[in-house]
Amino acid sequence: MHLVLAVTVRAQSAAHGVRETNAAVNVVEIFNAHVLPELQAPDLAARPIVKAGAIKFASTFRNQLPVETVRQLMPLLGNHLAAEQVVLHTYAAACIERFLGAKDAAGAPKFGRAELRPFLQPLVAALFALVEKAEQENEYVMKAIMRALSVAEGDVMPVTGEVLAKIKAALARVCANPRNPRFNHFLFESIAVLVRAVCGQDGGHVGAFEDALFPPFQTVLQMDVAEFTPYVFQAFARRG
């Protein structure tokens, strides 16, 4: 994988992926022949370093892989969120986030709301399962949640109750013991996105959000937790 990256990449940025490749190298053929079979293997514990390299390949060449390939890849990345190895489920979460943030040549989302819709519920459930069981807050997992909710927009309505309960639990933990500023940032951004998407579409949900979020928000304001206070007011502003 590293050799392929070295000879293929001509122009790349961390934020936007590979923009220019060696014309003599067919990225899609390499992906289908070598990367995809590794990610399709049922044993998540086998060859973790190779699997991590395969996920990195997919993430690096997200601009070159066609949407049809990404549709095939999404459930495989979701499966790897269940891997015990931190490096694997972290790479999988980061790869999901980067595909959801990728743009096509015209600047439109490459894998947008319609493409995400069939995978939204299982992906969000798998990501929150990691948030619940992780000993350390994983900022890449939380960023993937934020991105998925942002791309989904109104499609998040059917899973609002489940997502709100998970966010409430995570919020209670970080308010009691804030440790990872980037994780906290993406958590509060997820709250703001969810409030905008759900309450902006149906004001009948405002009460449920208030019941879930006001207790931890009140704790933040009463204890004057400076790093969280701006996020609390941002969430209030987006309530609708």
Question: Positions of the model-derived regions?
Answer:
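Karyopherin-beta/Importin-beta family HEAT-repeat alpha-solenoid scaffold
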Residues: M1-G240
